[in-house]
Amino acid sequence: PELDLRPREAITQRLVEDLTEGRLDAALVALPVSEPGLTEYPLFEEEFILVRPQSDADKPVPNPETLREMRLLLLEEGHCFREQAISFCKLGSALPRDLMEGSSLTTLVQMVGAGIGVTLIPQMAVGIETRSAAVSVARLPAPRPSRMIGLVWRKTNPLGSQLAQIAELIRTS
């Protein structure tokens, strides 16, 4: 079938607003979004990956408690990935001892490459974001932090059945 894809990136809150107001047909987001007017279709689990300076490649991988004591580089407030990373470190309302913010994953990874700190990024971003930086990547110890990625659309969307078929194709591939 003909499909006119027009991808765009935005924070989850804006995507949800655009969905509910009819400006978007569907969005790939971290679940749950808990919006009653939206259908959520879980697609896959995505792991968080630690990015640290290349010089730390041979050091033990830190656990959440150790991460709290390191200079942690996170996305600015409003990004759901920031909240998910803080939740993994079990920081609650307390921020890491030494926190710095960046506006994008690219900025955070370049800051890590410059030796400023460490960060967590989604597994699907590792290949692109780390290819030109002097960094090492590592899986965190179990239980590994992750999030569910899903396709979301308005329950009233006339394309709902087609979107469910697309979601199932993504999920099974």
Positions of PLM-derived features:
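Central regulatory/effector-binding core of bacterial HTH transcription factors
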Residues: P1-P36, L95, E101-G102
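Generic preference for hydrophobic
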Residues: P7, L28, E40, L50-V51, ...
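Alpha-helix/helix-capping structural signal
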Residues: Q13, S55, H79, T106, ...
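Well-formed, non-transmembrane alpha-helical positions, independent of function
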Residues: E17-D18, P42, E65-T66, F88, ...
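Beta-alpha-beta core module
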Residues: S34-E46, P60-P62, T106-T156
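Flexible hinge/capping segments at coil-to-helix
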Residues: E35-L73, E77
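Thr-Gly-centered strand-to-loop micro-motif
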Residues: R52, L75-E76, P96-D98, I121-P122
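Secondary-structure junction motif
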Residues: D58, P62, M70-G92, L159-A167, ...
